[in-house]
Amino acid sequence: MARSGDSNEVVARWEGGWRATVQAGPFSFAVDEPEEVGGTFTGPMPTEYFLGSLASCYALALAWSARKRGIELPDLEVSAVGEYDGPRFKQIRLTVNTSLPVEQLEPLLAPASRVCYVSNTLAHAPEIDVRQADVCA
C-alpha cells in the first residue's frame, strides 16, 4: 500500500489518430475512441478506463474491508456510471452488487471509502501540473 510521498507513474504514447498505448509498469493497454468519432475502436475510451479505475479500486477496497473483518465475500461487482456534463462527469454513481446480506455489507462501505485511492482522489481533487519535458539537444 502506498504511503504519503510515494508516487506512481504511467506513460501514454500516442499511436496516431485517437489511439494511445499506456505503459503501467510491466503492463500495457490500448486506449481508443469509437469509430463514429474517428477512432479505430481497438480499446476502451479514456473515460471508460477512468470509471473502471474507480469501480475496481472500490471493489478491491471492499474486499480488503471484508477480509479485515473476517467476512467472506461470496461475490462482488461494482459498477460505475458517469453522467457527462460537457468535457467532464458531473456525477458518478457506484453500485455494489453482491449476495452478501445488506447488514453485513453496510459496515464495509465506510472503511472501503476511506482506503479507496481513486474515490479519495476524486473527492479531494489534486492539483494537475502540466509541463513540457526537457528536450536534450
Model-derived segments and their meaning:
Residues 1-52, 60-137:
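Extended beta-strand/beta-hairpin segments
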